[in-house]
UniProtKB/Swiss-Prot annotation:
Family: Belongs to the universal ribosomal protein uS13 family.
Signal sequence annotation: none
Gene: rps13
Alphabetized PANTHER family for the sequence: 30S RIBOSOMAL PROTEIN S13/40S RIBOSOMAL PROTEIN S18, SMALL RIBOSOMAL SUBUNIT PROTEIN US13
Record-level GO BP terms: translation
Protein name per UniProt: Small ribosomal subunit protein uS13
Subunit structure: Part of the 30S ribosomal subunit. Forms a loose heterodimer with protein S19. Forms two bridges to the 50S subunit in the 70S ribosome.
InterPro entries found in the cross-reference section: Rbsml_uS13_C, Ribosomal_uS13, Ribosomal_uS13-like_H2TH, Ribosomal_uS13_archaeal
Organism per entry: Methanococcus maripaludis (strain DSM 14266 / JCM 13030 / NBRC 101832 / S2 / LL)
GO CC, alphabetical: cytosol; small ribosomal subunit
Molecular functions (GO terms): rRNA binding; structural constituent of ribosome
Amino acid sequence: MTQTEFKHRIRISKTDLEGKNPLEYALQDMKGIGRAMARAVIRVTELDPKQQAGYLADEDVLKIESVLEDPATHGIPSWMFNRKKDVYSGLDKHLIETDLVLTVQEDITNMKKIRCYKGIRHELRLPCRGQRTRGSFRKGTSMGVKRKK
């Protein structure tokens, strides 16, 4: 592996990443990629996780993008994906960046539309996962206590 010139910002899958960070940590700056997925991508592409991301060659960037595009064909197990059994296609997918954000928004909108419990809680801007609400999640202005004159 030859050292190419250092780039302070590298662009992978429509995302700018810091070139000074090690590759493992630079990949984790992308929305939808955590520690386990970053390590899996690096293992599949056979790159050095400690290498600064700014020294990546263009071929290596293309390799990383192809793995992120379709991780299943590169041997990454489906239990690592962030969207198992997609509602519309039935496939296991791993979404990143804007695809992930838009899909989550679409799921919440669908829950609101079918009026399920989680959808109603989202509409009311209350927690969906069973937290207690007596002391927390209070929004808006309160009247307070009026003082006698």
